Design a protein with these regions (language model features):
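Catalytic-site microenvironment of enzymes
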Residues: 1-169
Length: 169
């Protein structure tokens, strides 16, 4: 899965390959195609940051049109409550799923454990939960410790994101 840098409300640096709301359609499409081609083969994309871009329905439609053409899925990190990603994905027949919990906004052991337990509770209640984390040393260490015991101790099974994708009708 390609974490695609997208414009945030806070105007954080996106780095090379980022997509923003000021781009014309041709620039947006060219930048997106370059990113997708640079990291192929991939199966899907998620937004890295992106609170401003994912709230822009027109640009989400542009994004989903390219993902649909390549039969790629989209994982919405839900960095804003105003995200339009799921609506655009459904309209353009792109398989998608949205984040339920961020694991590592707080990287302390207590913070990681709190969010992990929140995800477990949601998974039990809803039948699934999408937990997004980053490759921080603290997060990796936490997951190395907790994942091996997940099914036996917690009664929750880890699955790939593809198993949770919502297929548009």
């Amino acid at each position: 899965m390609l974490p695609l840098p997208m414009e945030s409300m806070a105007s954080l640096s996106m780095g090379e390959g980022g997509l923003d709301t000021q781009m014309s359609r041709s620039v947006f499409d060219a930048r997106l195609q370059a990113s997708l081609n640079a990291f192929s083969p991939i199966q899907g994309v998620n937004n890295h940051m992106g609170s401003k871009l994912t709230a822009d329905r027109e640009r989400m439609d542009w994004l989903m049109a390219q993902l649909a053409a390549r039969q790629l899925f989209f994982v919405d990190s839900r960095t804003t409550k105003d995200t339009q990603a799921a609506f655009a994905a459904q309209a353009l027949n792109v398989d998608s799923v949205s984040r339920d919990v961020f694991l590592d906004n707080e990287r302390s052991t207590a913070g990681l454990e709190q969010e992990f337990k929140r995800a477990l509770a949601l998974a039990r209640k809803q039948g699934s939960a999408v937990l997004i984390g980053h490759p921080y040393p603290e997060s990796l260490s936490f997951l190395e410790r907790r994942l091996p015991e997940l099914e036996e101790r917690e009664g929750v099974r880890l699955v790939s994101v593809q198993a949770l994708l919502t297929r548009p009708h």
